[in-house]
Amino acid sequence: MKISRRPQFGRMVTPIPDRSRPVYRWFQMEESFSSQLVLTLCDLWGLGRDSLVVDPFCGAGTTLLACKERGIQSVGFDVHPLCLFVSEAKTRNYDVAGLENCVRQILEAEAEPAESPPEWTERYFPPGLPCEILGLRGEIERLERNERMFLLLGLARAAIACSWAEVDGAVLRVRKRKVRPFRQVLSRILLEMLEDLRSLKTEPVEPRIEERDARRMNLPEGSADAAITSPPYLFKTEYIRAYRLEEWLLGLQPRQPAAFFGGNSDPEAYFSDMREFAGELAKILKPGALSCIVAADGCSRHGVVRIADRMYEIAGRSGFSVKKVLLVNERWCTTPSRRKLGRAGEYIFILKRR
């Protein structure tokens, strides 16, 4: 197996290029790749309006939104409630004029909450803010689906911006600080989101988004033309618990860790999950279809767990030819005391369905 070093592609597998891109910036995850990666692959692989692209771990919706820019049909699966919500909110066909009226209505609303906020949430906000958030959420939930999703995402973003919450791995800590007035922040975010919809030119195609395990996808055999995805990284399970505040703000029900791919800390269990996923991916792809899988070595307290050889073996046994393995990033794996254990690689695997 040949591994080619391509550090020039390193930023493409991070969310950094999309931090200023309209709509993409509404919500990003630490391990998200960029729209630049998806758009580049769509062009290189000649994907068009008659193509179907699948992202079995759709995350923050980057693949789906990039395909919408190109007018390409796409399907996204995930089991994380927040990922499903965000992916759908980013890719709907919105009536911007209608949204403007709804935004005005919500910004002027004075509503009492129908329920009290859970006790655990109050430590993360200035006094009184959770009740104000719940009151507005009640008003938003009366709206039609598209308007409701747009405004709920804006509400959650504003609430987090005005909170005392600070994410430290999988732990949500409290850092009390002075925050700007909530209504002022909410107004700025919602107006910015409206402007994003005007700025990002997309086609009216809407992706299909479903809650579905990537090892059991709901697609006919041989139906997809390409896959662009990034499974959860080995040992990187923080995303399972790190967003519980956002889930509460959006009214979502958290899933148990056992429901997630790679949720077990055992490397062999992770590679077993990967084998199941690769077999399912091979089943739904057309012969000759190309796939891009972004994955990384795992960091444990014992050192670096290399994945490239195992991924190569799994791909070959599942019906793929490995066309390229690109090492695009390397980061030090360290102990909590910052002792260096080795360098962990981040890779782009290009596979072809045999």
Residue spans for each PLM region:
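Conserved proline-anchored active-site loop of SAM-dependent methyltransferases
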Residues: 38, 51-67, 74-80, 87, ...
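Conserved phosphoryl-transfer catalytic core
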Residues: 81-143, 251-260
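A SAM-dependent methyltransferase catalytic signature shared across enzymes that methylate proteins
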Residues: 141-145, 160, 275, 279, ...
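SAM-dependent methyltransferase catalytic-core segment centered on the flexible catalytic loop
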Residues: 226, 232-285, 289
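Class I S-adenosyl-L-methionine
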Residues: 299, 304-305, 312-314, 320-354
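SAM-dependent nucleic-acid methyltransferase catalytic core
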Residues: 130-229, 234-241
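S-adenosyl-L-methionine
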Residues: 1-48
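Acceptor-substrate binding/catalytic loop of class I
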Residues: 25-29, 116-128, 263-272, 294-309
